[in-house]
Regions:
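Short, Lys/Arg-rich, polar N-terminal cytosolic tail immediately upstream
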Residues: 1-4
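Solvent-exposed, non-transmembrane regions of membrane-associated and secreted proteins
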Residues: 6-250
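C-terminal single-pass membrane-anchor helix
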Residues: 240-283
Length: 283
């Protein structure tokens, strides 16, 4: 009897370890895939809203942005570091709240990133997507522009900017703003202290966009900056983005299907094992 109980305990322990291991393996993959689906809904809403605007509304918005960027250029000081400043965190989780604060879309095909860009840099938004660093330029096609887009790295439930270090000089990334798409070619990659904000200053005759996240991984004492200079958006780039969008969606869908099948398989094994244990216990 004692021997049977011992084997029963070992069997139950192995089943628990198997389930725990599967959950630990799948959690970051499934979490990221679900976050991607959620972000895609926010992006779709933003795109539909932008496409529905009439020409007069678009022209008024373009005028407002140019005036806002002129004010930002005169101030010449980017906002505080979003990863160290203490700011009250809104706990609202409704999707329409995020949709209301979405001002752009960042796409980085090289690392399979497509995220909504929010207008505030508090942790609520940074855990979901990317954000425009306060005090930096709105995306625009003119000169004297330096847009800074920031996001988290290393979250278990979402990759976000985790793969940003994989970008190299010459790679492209894109910002969708209203009904326009701006293309950027990476020309500078550097690591700075959180206080070295002068690196993000506007250069009078240039149009830059910088992607910012924490580094080193797990330590987060410094900031990784990947700067791109604006280049013309071509028809070939449009095709690249369409292909990257399909890959992005298919990858997330494949992860969810694989995870579901794996859990069904493990569940089947566990069910059969429990049934077998009950039979052994009766005998």
């Amino acid at each position: 009897m004692k021997k049977k109980r011992k084997y029963l305990f070992i069997d139950i322990l192995m089943l628990i370890i198997m389930l725990g291991g599967a959950c630990a393996l799948l959690y970051p993959l499934v979490g990221d895939a679900l976050n991607n689906f959620w972000n895609q809904q926010v992006i779709n809403y933003y795109q539909e809203k932008s496409n529905a605007e009439n020409r007069e509304a678009i022209q008024q918005e373009e005028k407002r942005i140019k005036e806002e960027n002129k004010k930002i250029a005169k101030m010449g000081v980017p906002g505080n570091d979003p990863f160290t400043k203490k700011k009250p965190e809104n706990t609202t989780l409704e999707k329409d709240y995020y949709q209301k604060h979405t001002i752009a879309v960042i796409r980085i095909p090289k690392i399979n990133v497509a995220l909504p860009v929010f207008d505030q840099t508090d942790n609520l938004f940074l855990k979901r997507g990317a954000a425009l660093l306060e005090g930096t330029s709105y995306p625009d096609g003119g000169k004297g522009i330096h847009t800074v887009i920031t996001s988290h790295r290393g979250l278990k439930e979402a990759r976000l900017f985790s793969d940003l270090p994989k970008l190299k000089k010459g790679n492209h990334f894109y910002l969708e703003y209203k009904n326009q798409t701006f293309a950027y070619k990476v020309d500078k990659i550097q690591t700075i202290e959180p206080t070295e904000v002068e690196t993000l200053n506007i250069v009078e005759d240039k149009n830059y966009a910088t992607l910012m996240t924490c580094t080193p991984y797990g330590v987060n004492s410094h900031r990784l900056l990947v700067r791109g200079t604006r280049i013309p958006f071509s028809e070939g780039m449009k095709k690249t983005l369409a292909k990257a969008d399909r890959v992005h969606r298919n990858r997330s869908l494949a992860i969810l299907i694989f995870s579901l099948l794996l859990m069904i398989g493990i569940g089947s094994i566990v069910f059969k094992r429990i049934k077998s244990l009950k039979v052994r216990k009766r005998s």
